[in-house]
Every structure is written in structure tokens, then in C-alpha cells.
Amino acid sequence: MKKKLFICFLLIGSLMGNVMAQDIITNPLLFVFKLHGQTRKYQFTFNQSNDTLYLHWGIERNTRWQSGSYAMPQEALKTAVRLSFLQPEDGQHICLPIQETFALLSATAFQELKSQKAFHYNQTEYQLADTKSQAMGYSLLHVNDSVDGCEMWIMDNPDFPLIWEIQ
């Protein structure tokens, strides 16, 4: 009997957890990160303020909401040559240098990709593989590098070249 009560309690608790998670996630983008057998779902929202683009992130972890942000100056959005791989830490608000972006390509790199079907980022050349996929009404530019086998899918949107997926 105790075993059945315990199982019922767990089922009710898990259903309530799902309801709470739905209340937290409204209309921002939800990205899933998988690394070393771990999976994390991050909520991203983007806000422009003056000459800086802010990526605010959040995640529910251990029944607690954690959040932070990345700030990308306008110069970085135009001419950056590197992706930042700084891991999000709760409460951290990171101002990226003008050479780096997070989750976006710079306008220069995007133009290079569109005109030459290749671009350089993090001292690596990525070449266009295909444009078969779509997300949010945009084609995704599938690129890969021949050295490490990294693949990225980038939204074909010159105003907002969001990196949709990395493998």
C-alpha cells in the first residue's frame, strides 16, 4: 500500500512540475543543449538597447530559476570573427568583446557565407552544405567544417543570422 501511495505521489508531483514549467516558458525561443550525456533546455530572449544586443537566458534547474545574459556591442554584430563558448552561469551578465558573438553570426561573416558559400569563424572555415531545412519561416544554411566535422544550421536572415543548431 505504501508503495502505491508513493507512486501516486510521484505521478502527481511530476504532473505539477510540468504545469509549473509551462507557466515559466511563455513565448521566447527554447534551445536544447546536449553535451557529454547531459541535456539542458535554455530559454533565450533577445532585446536591443541603445547600441547593444542582449541575449537573456534562463533555465529551470533543481526547482529553481537560473538566469543571466550576454551583451553584444553593435561592433561585434557587424564584424566579429569568433563565437563565444562561455558557459552560462547563474547571475552572470557577460559583456562580450567586439571580436565575439553568442548564438549569432556577425554581419560580415553572414555576407561572406552568402557571397562565397563559405565563411571563417574561430579561425575555422565553414562551407555551405545545403539549404534544405527551415525554422521560423526561414531557410537554414547548413554549414560544416572539414577539419573537426562541426556542423551548424544558421537562419538565412541577414538582419538576424541566428545559429539554430550546432553539432
Please describe what each predicted stretch is.
Residues 4-15:
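Sec-dependent N-terminal signal peptides
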Residues 16-21:
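Sec/Tat signal peptide C-region and signal peptidase I cleavage site
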Residues 22-87, 91-167:
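Acidic, serine/threonine-rich low-complexity disordered tracts
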